[in-house]
Amino acid sequence: MTKALDGVRVLDFTHVQSGPTCTQLLAWFGADVIKVERPGSGDITRGQLQDIPKVDSLYFTMLNHNKRSITLDTKNPKGKEVLTALIRTCDVLVENFGPGVLDRMGFTWEKIQEINPRMIVASIKGFGPGPYEDCKVYENVAQCTGGAASTTGFREGLPLVTGAQIGDSGTGLHLALGIVTALYQRHHTGRGQRVTAAMQDGVLNLCRVKLRDQQRLDHGPLKEYSQFGEGIPFGDAVPRAGNDSGGGQPGRILKCKGWEQDPNAYIYVITQAPVWEKICDVIGETGWKMHPDYATPPARLSRLNEIFARIEQWTMTKTKFEAMEILNADDIPCGPILSMKELAEDQSLRATGTIVEVDHPTRGKYLSVGNPIKLSDSPTEVKRSPLLGEHTDEILRDVLGYSDAHVAEIHDSGATAPPRKQAAE
């Protein structure tokens, strides 16, 4: 079956997480992604957080499925020759180097356009143009500078980063959308273009409801936040609001049966207005249906702590799955707190390809996330990540059309192998 991005060839200069997230998505949709790696070492994540000695880490394997790997010393003249040929052949170049690295390699935007005017050059940086553009950024730095940390956690506690990789993987998702948009525009213009995504920008985009609330503060307190009901004044910036819902409909994480032993025996419950009377029935507070202090959403806002404490009395008598079954029967929005162990063992996620089992030649079988985006006419088959330089000869021959003699010449030049260490005299 033809894949959505069949015929698109991507030159992948990315490393660690943000860039590989982007290029893995493109590969899942059928693009031929050629990962260019440093001879002898490759992507640094091959050796980071290793759980099995001398085997590519899960950090690497889970971010580089469906790709091909070529090792190339881009400082070597023959290596530069190969890279130039790849730029001429590929549709997209993706990189998440520090600012200016690609230029110092001799491949400025102008040079790349000279080689291939149809080339799309996509870049992830920590910050956009401005006072911080030369600063190094990692996941948690992006969360802290993009508005996530200042609005995550509890009011009297430290700012917190989230377990979701919204800085790295989130920006990779944004860049992938930018790339396919640029590819579509190229059909009309015939020209390539630059696509950039800054990690700070990506995090802020995902925190848009907090920017919404920042402006609402100019007109009064945020009444759906817990501190309103507690009578605590608001400052001039959006506060941390614990587990309060950010969507305008009050919600909290509540204890369930077994919470004393199980750190994940909790459920999230939302007191949505259309199902308020059903909530009252479930928890045995039928008198609240018509009581002026509880009957309307505005009346309930100052009493949310009391209301959720009462709902929690009920949820503590049920397991999180029992509570979910009862609440869902009445269309009451809720969701159990699922551990990674529970998710890994969820057969429904296996059936949809959201979690997949992959077989690797040195690691063996392991679990990975699959493509979260499902296309009816372009299903994703998750294939293992490449070994370092596994496809070097294949790419030189099949993509660039080099003869056996030319391939041997490239190898003999040292362009595909780590530099030899000279013995001390």
UniProtKB/Swiss-Prot annotation:
- What GO molecular function annotations does the UniProt record carry, in alphabetical order? formyl-CoA transferase activity
Signal peptide range in chain numbering: none
Where CoA binds, per the record, is at 17-18, 38, 72-75, 96-98, 104, 136-139
- What InterPro entries does this protein's entry cite? CoA-transferase_III_domain, CoA-Trfase_fam_III, CoA-Trfase_III_dom3_sf, CoA-Trfase_III_dom_1_sf, Formyl_CoA_transfer
Q: Which domain of life is it from?
A: Bacteria
Active site location? D168 (nucleophile)
In the Enzyme Commission scheme, what number(s) does this protein have?
A: 2.8.3.16
Q: In which pathway does it act?
A: Metabolic intermediate degradation; oxalate degradation; CO(2) and formate from oxalate: step 1/2
The record's Gene Ontology biological-process terms are: oxalate catabolic process
Q: Which UniProt keywords apply?
A: Transferase
Reaction catalysed? formyl-CoA + oxalate = oxalyl-CoA + formate
* Residues that, per the record, bind substrate: G247, G248, Q249
Broadest EC class? transferase
PANTHER family tied to this protein: SUCCINATE--HYDROXYMETHYLGLUTARATE COA-TRANSFERASE
How does the annotation summarize its subunit structure? Homodimer.
NCBIfam families hit by this protein? oxalate_frc (TIGR03253), PRK05398.1 (NF003809)
**Classification via HAMAP family:** Formyl_CoA_transfer
Q: Per the similarity annotation, which family is this? A: Belongs to the CoA-transferase III family. Frc subfamily.
Question: What does the UniProt record say this protein does?
Answer: Involved in the catabolism of oxalate and in the adapatation to low pH via the induction of the oxalate-dependent acid tolerance response (ATR). Catalyzes the transfer of the CoA moiety from formyl-CoA to oxalate.
**The name this protein goes by in its record:** Formyl-CoA:oxalate CoA-transferase
Name the source organism: Rhodopseudomonas palustris (strain TIE-1)
Question: Its encoding gene is what?
Answer: frc
